[in-house]
Amino acid sequence: RNFANDATFDIKKCDVHRLEEGPPTTAVLTREEGLKYYKIMQTVRRMELKADQLYKQKIIRGFCHLYDGQEACCMGLEAGINPTDHVITAYRAHGFTYTRGLPVREILAELTGRRGGCAKGKGGSMHMYAKNFYGGNGIVGAQVPLGVGIALACKYNEKDEICLTLYGDGAANQGQIFEAYNMAALWKLPCIFICENNRYGMGTSVERAAASTDYYKRGDFIPGIMVDGMDVLCVREATKFAAAYCRSGKGPMLMELQTYRYHGHSMSDPGVSYRTREEIQEVRSKSDPIMLLKDRMVNNNLASIEELKEIDVEVRKEIEDAAQFATADPEPPLEELGYHIYSRDPPFEVRGANQWIKYKSVS
């Protein structure tokens, strides 16, 4: 069967703040890109559903915040930047850890606290890191000043790199975010502030938490755009637009991605006490990011349903194998508790004794 090489799609116009014009309202998707995006988004979705299952079996313990429903955000952002650019986010970090290049098995093994995990089983759900990905961060909003620091480093070192600094609609009300806006604007830092607005901060809807829910205007003197966070192409085009702005030396930009999480805030939240099952169902049936991409591809002869089903089978197998690894891999031994605290073995002595000898550095 002859497939089309690419297709052009109309995408939702972004609302803008302090800008003459926003990102384009059309996007070209090649067949190759479409298949890649589909596979990555489907992998994130299945990985999160597997994490849900392992949590309910008490194999994953502690904090666990799932990303299903928001796959268009991590995929679209990654598609709009370079691998050498930087990303930092809050604790809903599994999707970004994957799009930044880590294999599923290392992510699931981190969730189960095993040696093969990306942080050697010591970080868990909220503390995963990859190349140029500065992780999940457990404190609400605390990653935003860090992201501005990364952008400062990019500028200071005269690198043509930018930092995507993510936070949620709940964290948007944190004072430190406004302090970070000010510094980024003052020093014209290459930072894109990205508010993933999934409508609820824990159990509080945006209307109950914010006097103004136009998060993209919150930067006041920083230009902002409001983006459909359920459409991977919309997110990609907006990211390219914001990245070009930041790279040109004009300073920061704010992006609000309007998205939705299918799970509760964390695994301890069933997610239905402050919103109705019907609301979740409606989003799933009308604006699911994976369904939207799939329909576009099938209806525009970029892929066949059979081909996408084959990808689904591949993804499921990859997730099953990863889960197998994450449950069979050994836990780190107790004596490694103090390892990896210092990047190099500390040489200094206190009162003639080296207290740190037991905290070896690299494994």
UniProtKB/Swiss-Prot annotation:
SUPFAM superfamilies: Thiamin diphosphate-binding fold (THDP-binding) (SSF52518). Thiamine diphosphate binds at Y91, R92, G138, V140, D169, G170, A171, N198, H265. It is an enzyme of class 1 (oxidoreductase). Keywords: Acetylation, Carbohydrate metabolism, Glucose metabolism, Magnesium, Metal-binding, Mitochondrion, Oxidoreductase, Phosphoprotein, Pyruvate, Thiamine pyrophosphate, Transit peptide, Tricarboxylic acid cycle. This is Pyruvate dehydrogenase E1 component subunit alpha, mitochondrial. The modification N6-succinyllysine is found at K36, K217, K250, K286, K358. Phosphorylation at Ser-205, Ser-266 and Ser-273 by PDK family kinases inactivates the enzyme; for this phosphorylation at a single site is sufficient. Phosphorylation at Ser-266 interferes with access to active site, and thereby inactivates the enzyme. Dephosphorylation at all three sites, i.e. at Ser-205, Ser-266 and Ser-273, is required for reactivation. Acetylation alters the phosphorylation pattern. Deacetylated by SIRT3. Its cofactor is thiamine diphosphate; Mg(2+). Its EC number is 1.2.4.1. CDD domains: TPP_E1_PDC_ADC_BCADC. NCBIfam families: PDH_E1_alph_y. The modification Phosphoserine is found at S205, S266, S268, S273. One of its GO terms (molecular function) is metal ion binding. Residues 1-2 form a transit peptide. Pyruvate dehydrogenase activity is inhibited by phosphorylation of PDHA1; it is reactivated by dephosphorylation. Disulfide bonds: none annotated. Heterotetramer of two PDHA1 and two PDHB subunits. The heterotetramer interacts with DLAT, and is part of the multimeric pyruvate dehydrogenase complex that contains multiple copies of pyruvate dehydrogenase (E1), dihydrolipoamide acetyltransferase (DLAT, E2) and lipoamide dehydrogenase (DLD, E3). These subunits are bound to an inner core composed of about 48 DLAT and 12 PDHX molecules. The keyword Magnesium applies. Pfam families: E1_dh (PF00676). Mg(2+) binds at D169, N198, Y200. It is found in: Mitochondrion matrix. It catalyses: N(6)-[(R)-lipoyl]-L-lysyl-[protein] + pyruvate + H(+) = N(6)-[(R)-S(8)-acetyldihydrolipoyl]-L-lysyl-[protein] + CO2. One of its GO terms (biological process) is glucose metabolic process. The modification N6-acetyllysine is found at K36, K217, K240, K286, K294, K309. GO terms for cellular component: mitochondrial matrix; pyruvate dehydrogenase complex.
